[in-house]
Each structure stands twice: as C-alpha cells, then as structure tokens.
Amino acid sequence: MGSLLPLLGISVVSAIFFLVLQQPEQSSSAIILSLKKRHGSSSGSSGNQYSSSRPSAGFQGNRSTCSLFLGTWVRDNSYPLYKPADCPGVVEPEFDCQMYGRPDSDYLKYRWQPQNCNLPTFNGAQFLLKMKGKTIMFAGDSLGKNQWESLICLIVSSAPSTRTEMTRGLPLSTFRFLDYGITMSFYKAPFLVDIDAVQGKRVLKLDEISGNANAWHDADLLIFNTGHWWSHTGSMQGWDLIQSGNSYYQDMDRFVAMEKALRTWAYWVETHVDRSRTQVLFLSISPTHDNPSDWAASSSSGSKNCYGETEPITGTAYPVSSYTDQLRSVIVEVLHGMHNPAFLLDITLLSSLRKDGHPSVYSGLISGSQRSRPDQSADCSHWCLPGLPDTWNQLLYTLLIY
C-alpha cells in the first residue's frame, strides 16, 4: 500500500494546534502530491452555506494549498450517505439516534468542506478493490467502534451486492467482505496497553502491550485511538491499580499515564510492524460537548450539555477545551518522537464544531427514566450514525485512494 500515511504524519504531528480557522497550516495535500510523484504516480466555503449536490467523484482543488482538516460545515441536502437499514445489524443501539427517537434530522445534512479542495465522494466499490485481500484493524475505545461501524455502512450502502459476514465478540468483532477477501475488525483496547487481573484487581500495565497487540500484528491497515478512558473516575474508572515499571499506584497524573502507555504502543509499532506492508494511523481526540461555555455564543438549546443542540457551531474559532487540547498534545508529542511516525488522522478541530452530532438521550443504552434527566444522562461523547464518523472515514478514504 506504500508509505503515504507515515510521510503525511510527519507533517501533521508537527503542526501547531490551530484554534482559529484563518491561521495558516502546512498543506496535507501538498505532501500527498509530492509522495505520488515519488511513487511515480502521475475552494473553501464559510458559514453554513447550502449546497444542492455533493462534490464530484474525484479529488478537486489545489493540492498544494488544500487543508483537509481545516474548513467548515456546509449544509447539503444529498446527505446522509446511508441509512442504518442499508447496513442491517451493523449500527448498534448506542449510535442509532433516529431509531431511539431523536426528533430532528438536520444534523444529518452537513458535509465537511476543507479549505481549498473538496472531499471526493466515497465509493465503496473502489474502496473494496483498493483493499482486496487486506486486513483492516481498528483498535481502541468505543470511538474506534463508532468509526468502524460507520466505515462498514459506507461500504455496504454503496456496494450492496457484495456478500458479507459479521461476528461480534469481546474484545474482537469482525466484518468480512467475502467476495474481496477483506477482513475489517474492531478490537476493544481503550488504553491500548494491557489490563490484567491480579489477585482480583484490574491492573493497568503501562509498559506491557503484547496481550492486546497479538491480535494486531498481521493487519495491513491499523487505525488506533485512545483518550476518553484516561479521564474516567469513580465507578467509570477502568482500573484498580496502575503498574509502571516495578511500582504500583492507585492513581497518577492521567496525562503522564497516557504518555507512558502511548510510548509503549509506539515502541511496539516501531519494533513489530513491517511499515513497508502495514500502514498505521492514529485517530486524534474526539471532543466531547459537555460544557456549553465552550460554545455559549452559538448554543441553540440553553441546556447544560449537548442535549437539544441541532446545528453545528459557526464562525472562525474552534471551541476546543483545554482538556481535549492536552490529550491531543500527548498524542502529537509521542507520534512526533517516533522514527517513522504513524499518521495522525486529525479530526479534533472539525469534530469540535459538531455539538449537534451526539446521541444525547437518543441512545439505546439510555433508559426512559434517564431520558427525563438529560442534564445528567446525555451522551455527549459518542456520535450518531449516520453522522460525524462518516466524515472521518471520507478523510481516510481520500488519503488511501487519492
């Protein structure tokens, strides 16, 4: 598959974390172009403008100035790209917002418009041909599962005649495109490093990853993520003890712990993954929308979180919380320190504008009594499907195909 993504990563992980839309960014597509030459291969909108049709099938725009991860959301009545019924059994209840009573649908009608270029239309048949005989592995937390289910639906809905097979399990769930020999899996590993049971305690081992990584090493395309679970406390905390070296801790600075774990992951990638065969990506932090003060000027609901939000944030500033910024910075620092950096699929900024895209109380995991208390129960972390993760996968598709 070549070395496109690692080279792109060198640019992205070293970029400044831009909070203002107009600030300059090194062009990701310029690097795409230079790499295509090396391998011998031969305008942005503002505001919520209405578009009556999708961009044309291929990449359009100036590759030397295109900024895939900076841009704006534009209304597009040809969206969404699929319905859950197009991929039966794939979208789980926690992401199927329309099934569980979400009364509005405008949040489905937005398309990401990068600066100085258009994203190509997702073509499932083309993706299947490109990835024929390959194994794709998503590894991480439920945001990775969000993206995995989205990618399956994008492919199945645009190439409905292909034979498929799905098995769900813990930690591994797998979807197969039988006619193309493609295996696409999700492996649940919210911290990436191992958690072992020791004398009845869940021990998070910051220096060990082989227990999880044994499931990853044969993949041709690896997409990793971690982030949200490092902030959980109380009953939501994912460990009882943390082991670092020969020492055990009940807790430690969460950013320090995350960095240690990611350096263990990075060392594994550098020493166990054949980068001439396998491409490695890392999904940046998917932001939450639990605090309306982050977007107060454009709040449409007056609620205490994402509940009732029905449209994206407009304007030129990206409302990224300091905590999200710090989590992302840990990832950037670790990737930048790699000899051959994984490519950062940098969805943080564009996702921060989508306060309207979360399940809120319209999730199959939220009970009726919880729905009556949206200020306490709304899910403002995950994303509805169809929805925002479809754009993450359009970006992935663009990088792989173009």
UniProtKB/Swiss-Prot annotation:
Query: Where does the sequence pass through the membrane?
Result: 7-23
Q: Give the range the annotation lists for the signal sequence.
A: none
Annotated GO molecular function terms are: O-acetyltransferase activity
This protein's membrane topology, according to the annotation, is: Single-pass type II membrane protein
User: What GO terms in the biological process aspect are recorded for it?
Assistant: defense response; response to fungus
Q: Which UniProt keywords apply?
A: Membrane, Plant defense, Signal-anchor, Transmembrane, Transmembrane helix
Q: Region Disordered: list its residue ranges.
A: 40-60
Tissue-specific expression = Expressed in flowers, siliques, stems and leaves.
Concerning its family, UniProt says:
Belongs to the PC-esterase family. TBL subfamily.
Name used for this protein in its record: Protein PMR5
Q: Gene that codes for this?
A: PMR5
